Amino acid sequence: SFFKLCGQLMELHEENKFKVRSYTNAAFQISKFPDPLEEMDPDYYGSIPGVGKSLIPQIEDLLDTGRLPYLEEWIEKTPKGVIEMLGIKGIGPSKVRVIWKDMGIESPGELLYACNESRLIDYKACG
């Protein structure tokens, strides 16, 4: 979901932990909510657990335009391959940050190459 990716990117860039938690929690709650957002009256967005006042305008933007400008800002700050690494099972934003920032690896292909060379063993977050 848009909000899950936004939370992951915020964590990757070490954004405020409370903001990160807000986005990831909202993503989880929205995914578990029985009604699709598109079918809900906008007045009820706040009734979804975990969706606070600050996220409601973003939900409205997303439904009106199909875009989430706040997410797009985070995407612009992040190499495409790093975003792709967030989709690898078992590797969360914290490990991806170490792989990217400390090791200079910016794609799944580079990560595979580093694994084959056993370069990840030396890093606490990866070993």
Language-model features: locations:
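Double-stranded DNA-binding cores of transcription factors and transposases
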Residues: S1-P34
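Accessory alpha-helical DNA-binding modules that contact the DNA backbone or grooves
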Residues: R21-C126
